[in-house]
Design a protein with these regions (language model features):
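A short, N-terminal amphipathic alpha-helix
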Residues: 67-78, 107-110
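Active-site glycine-rich loop that binds ribose-phosphate moieties when present
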Residues: 131-143, 180-201, 249
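Glycine-rich anion-binding loops of enzyme active sites
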Residues: 35, 41, 48, 81-169
């Protein structure tokens, strides 16, 4: 690299976001965080590779934004309050314009999520971004994938399927005449929103929770396996957006909602008498047994990194 690692960090990655938990941030050998008394720490990490997780021509600001939101979504699924983030960035070269754009997107998403950047690493190689996020909850109030029980309702936030349509638009495989609809769907892929506030609400009422990254059916399968139950999904109940339904037929819209992935919505189970939070929809139920069932099974049920 033409710039030293120290110069890169100082120039592009210092002062991105603020957080009450940060005692010491970027610039020392390690960061120092203050965990609130009576709380426990949640930590998660996500790696994004060019070509596997984002398109080669995606703007650097969008790559940064998407990478942090994907990691933050794991905190949302636990019901955690965000504290801080770490970034490990592998670059083929030190491109000042690319780094400036990346830093802009990174600063925006760190501020929006409450995940100030407190450290990380840079090295040379094929483009890859690893984001580690930290959050906290009261010691006995975090969510897991393992609490669903027969009789619970299966619910989802938002409108899954939009991100899959957005990816097809960005790849040039889906042509949309209405530029505003095209932009809305593309943004669902490039600029997802981690449901952090919803997650903090759900931790008091949900029996189990997971974020949708691999696809709704695949992630429902994770809930079922971890909880030792069976889950039934009713595709007629899927909350499909008007934008999605305006660009593809109903069957394709359902398939993307069930298997598209990259939605970063929350999929969760609620006891039968618990009120459903605003912006969420019941799409199935938990029963005794194992596995998942659905009246419609897409050709590909979800993303598997090692299936190809």
């Amino acid at each position: 690299m033409t710039s030293s690692e120290f110069e890169l960090i100082q120039h592009y990655f210092t002062g991105l976001g603020e957080g009450a938990a940060v005692r010491l941030g970027v610039g020392d050998d390690a960061a120092v965080l203050q965990v609130p008394e009576g709380h426990v720490l949640q930590i998660s990490t996500d790696t994004a590779l060019e070509g596997a997780h984002f398109l080669a021509n995606l703007p650097a600001a969008d790559i940064a934004y998407r990478s942090v939101m994907a990691a933050a979504s794991d905190l949302a699924a636990m019901g955690a309050v965000p504290m801080a983030s770490l970034l490990s960035l592998t670059l083929p070269k030190a491109d000042s314009a690319w780094l400036r754009d990346f830093s802009t997107g990174l600063g925006a998403v760190c501020t929006e999520t409450g995940l100030p950047l407190v450290g990380g690493d840079t090295t040379r190689g094929p483009l890859a971004i690893t984001v580690t996020v930290m959050g906290s909850t009261p010691a006995d109030q975090f969510m897991t994938r393992s609490g669903a029980e027969p009789g619970d309702r299966l619910c989802v936030s938002g409108t899954p399927g939009d991100a899959a349509a957005g990816l097809e638009i960005l790849k040039g495989d889906l042509s949309v005449a209405d530029a505003s609809i095209s932009a809305v769907l593309a943004a669902r892929f490039t600029r997802p929103v981690a449901r952090l506030i919803l997650g903090q609400t759900l931790r008091d009422i949900a029996s189990a929770c997971i974020d949708i990254s691999d696809g709704l059916l695949a992630d429902a399968g994770h809930l079922a396996t971890c909880s030792g139950v069976a889950i039934e999904v009713d595709s007629s109940l899927l909350p499909l957006s008007d934008a999605l339904c305006s660009v593809v037929d109903m069957q394709q819209a359902k398939d993307w909602a069930l298997a598209g992935g990259d939605d970063y919505e929350l999929l969760f189970t609620l006891p039968c008498n618990t009120p459903l939070p605003a912006g969420c929809t019941q799409i199935g139920r938990v029963v005794s047994g194992s596995g998942i069932s659905c009246d419609r099974v897409p050709e590909r049920a979800g993303y598997d990194h090692f299936a190809h």
